[in-house]
Amino acid sequence: MLRSQRIIAMNIQPKITPVLDPGFVPAVLWNQAFEAKAAADPASHQVDIALTRNDGTCFRWSGKLLPHTGENIALNETYVERIVKFLLWQKGGNIILVAGDDAIADMLASRYCKGGIREFDWDFIGKKIYGSPIEVKKVSVEELPEEYSGSMTLGRNLDGCRIGFDLGGSDRKCAAVVNGEVVYSEEVVWDPYFQKDPQYHIDGIQDSLERAAAHLPRVDAIGGSSAGVIINSEVRTSSLFRGVSQEDIEKTLGKVFRTLQKEKWNNIPFEVVNDGEVTALAGAMGMNDNAVLG
């Protein structure tokens, strides 16, 4: 959402003006107007951005900017900063590589830093999710890495004796399955949000798994889902653990599923992902299709 003199400079007139927020302009209209303005200016220049992670994952974006002078500076900065913020939340990463405009790189570095106006994103996306603060670097186009996003095969396994669970804000759902047939299912009420002791969560998760295991001759694999950002079965942040200190999350709860796998479940396959991914998986299995949004 964009307002003030930047809208006036772009001369955008939405078809519908919100009564309670007459200055509101949908970002898509602003972006379209900016891109048309840049395309019409022969002095426009290209900027290339790569958003990367420590594991080598890389997402690329390219676009044209207006000559970086006068009133165009505010327009260019608004356009790129909004694009970068969207990419951080859509794709995810902690290193921003900028080629083609050093002034834009400097602007991003001054905003995505401690004390900058995007300090929250700098800390949350960078430190909490990807392990280190967001960093902005100036590079040449030749130095930008190629786009790379490793794919991961998720689930669709029904054979054998398996446990599935979901951690919610009001209850823990757990089921035992034998060759695709549910032999046990239970929802156990719990209150995780403001519990300060990590052991409360650990004991609750293990309790649900043991209840399900009691209905199986053996346990071949465990799969689970939870609210929050979960990468490689490790919790980076989750509303379920909001009462637990960041120190305890990093020390204990972040790797709770790996710890349970090793200490309680003999290192059998034990995978946990975000609950939206499991919803997408269920939809994909039901429709016998791929690329389903959960």
Task: Describe each model-derived feature in a short phrase.
Residues 1-9:
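Short, Lys/Arg-enriched N-terminal segments with co-localized hydrophobic residues
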Residues 13-148:
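N-terminal accessory interaction module
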Residues 37-39, 46-72, 167-207, 236-243:
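Short glycine-rich, Thr/Ser-proximal phosphate-binding strand/loop in the N-terminal lobe
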Residues 40-43, 86-93, 156-158, 214-217, ...:
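Flexible, charged surface loops at secondary-structure boundaries
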Residues 69-79, 87-91, 102-139, 188-203, ...:
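Glycine-rich phosphate-binding loop and adjoining helix at the ATP-binding site
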Residues 82-83, 199-215:
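Short, well-ordered amphipathic alpha-helical segments that serve as non-catalytic structural scaffolds
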Residues 95-97, 160-166, 219-223, 271, ...:
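Short glycine-aspartate micro-motif
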Residues 145-163:
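Long, contiguous juxta-domain segments that are non-catalytic but functionally important
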